[in-house]
Amino acid sequence: KFGVHSAMPSAQARKLCPDAIWTQGRFGRYREMSTRVMGILETETPLVEQVSIDEAFFDVTPGRYSHESPVSICRRIQESVSRLGITCSIGVGVNKTVAKIASEREKPRGLTVVYPGTEQAFLAPLPASAMSGIGAVTASRLAEMGIRTLGELSRADDARMRSVFGARGPQMIERAAGRETSHVRAAVAREDAKSVSNERTFEHDITDEDEILAAIMHVASLAGRRLRTKGLRGQTVTLKIKYDAFHARTAQRRLPSPTNDEQVFGTAACELLGELWHAGMPVRLVGVGMSGFDAETAEQMALFDAGDEQPGRVRASDALSEVTDRLKERFGDDMVGYGRDLRFRHHVSDTTPMGKSDF
């Protein structure tokens, strides 16, 4: 009605619609959801090229990583994303240009498929500006040349386009004709995780033992969720205590069997506190890490449950972790948690060490 559209500068939008109601965004939450969506894509194919916080190319070419139909894969991705409480639009095509344009055709939650051999019929009637890289200035120059649609651009004279736009000119012709050759370039994969750990730095030193123990269990819960997300179970727990900017100590314990249950390894970390701390010592930072990984699917089941780990209690703990993980994934990290976590929700900074050298 007022001419306001997405990606428009807010100053311009305010001029067009001065009576609009403005709300503040939550970039941290936006970034969190972006990470989760990219994680969903990576469960379908290792070739995921993120190009912005809310956009990515991914390769599901039949036979490359799966024999399943790309359309079926994309529908499953949309269903997974919808469980986060958001929507996504997907375009399917033989190259990036076609897929990108197709993704813009139907929103929200659109799925536009351009089958091989139909690219020119799909692209030809669209305005030249529908193709990425053609902004207002380029579109205006093309219009002066009598080129207003992608079909007209695909039939443009190669030499003339080169004289006006340089080497980019012939490339624009190829892209407009749907003949672009492009590859999805996945981000360089990190080395396989050697450890998963989290730390919390407190605004003020803490000296109370109960509060330190609660902090250890809180940080363990953060590491536990990351372990489950990665499908990992560790057998060595490490506790780190930092007293000030220059003094820190760590202690380790090997557990009877691999686990990703923070109630198990968090309790073990609490038992390590006596090796690093004595009453009255000020604590600035607490860290809990797990290493000695065994892939979750390769876990060997024990013939008998170890010692005091009652089978029913262990199963209930696993079920509780699974449910809380799902709730946090859908509604955010603050949706559910233990009462002890409330005291650490503010006045702390959270860090995630990347490896043993950081831990």
Give the role of each language-model region:
Residues K1-E174, A187, R225, P311-F359:
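Gly/Gly-Pro- and Ser/Thr-rich, intrinsically disordered tail segments characteristic of DNA damage-repair
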Residues V51-E55, G93-K96, L232-T236, M281-L285:
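Short Gly/Ser/Thr- and Asp/Glu-enriched loop/turn motifs at secondary-structure junctions
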Residues A56-P62, T250-R253, A302-G307:
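Short, hydrophobic beta-strand segments
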Residues F58, I90, L239-I241, R253, ...:
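Preference for bulky hydrophobic residues occupying beta-strand positions
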Residues A130, T138-V283, A295-A298:
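DNA-contacting surface of Y-family translesion DNA polymerases
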Residues S257-F359:
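Acidic, metal-coordinating catalytic segment for phosphate/diphosphate chemistry
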